[in-house]
Amino acid sequence: MLARLSFRIASPPRLRVFLPLLAALLPLAMPGAARADGPLRPDTMAARVAACTACHGEQGRAGADGYYPRLAGKPAEYLYHQLLNFRDGRRQYRPMAHLLAGLPDAYLREIAAYFSGQHAPYPPPARAEAAAAVLEAGRALALEGDRARGLPACVSCHGAELGGMLPAIPGLLGLPRDYIGSQVGAWKNGLRRAAPPDCMADVAARLTPADIAALAAWLSSRPVPASYAPQPAGAAQLPAECGGQGQR
């Protein structure tokens, strides 16, 4: 497993991520493995996912640098399909691909279930650093869509409070602006994909760069309500067919 980590670090700041990730890899790759030079570590899921929390934060509450998203509390099916997508090449991020290579589907489901069951508190939203007109454009797209361009509102799939919908549609609040923008941009540019029919790719293809910036600014500025949680499966009729009910 360690031999797989021969990838090149893209920039010096990523070194602070690489070193704890390297140290944490063994428990994830070899469940139950003991250290030969020290006492046995408890074989808990929390110990096994140390490679995940090295970047995604304690309990998966999000990395401090605004790039690594929150995992805690997201639908287990969503997390599971993202792990599959990284492992199988539908999402492109080399450290994740190396980390997950060779891990079986059943173990990925265990990881997904663990993080889905974490309910760490959300931090307050970042201060909106965008003009009022930009924020209004983002609000309109998120809550109303743009029928003339065939753009459904974000709430039509992601729920009235943008908390997602079971089994596999994620919430959109509590995420950093840069992460939201980069992921929608990846959909638009074909660097992120999902099981067909890929409804998010269809939506992202219709968004302009200004649309993406406005959505990212507005969504990241919204406080997370106390009732924030995924809606039950089938709570709303999706505006388009999505592979595996929105494996996004």
Residue spans for each PLM region:
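Short cysteine/histidine-rich metal-coordination sites, predominantly Zn2+-binding motifs
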Residues: 69-74, 157, 170-178
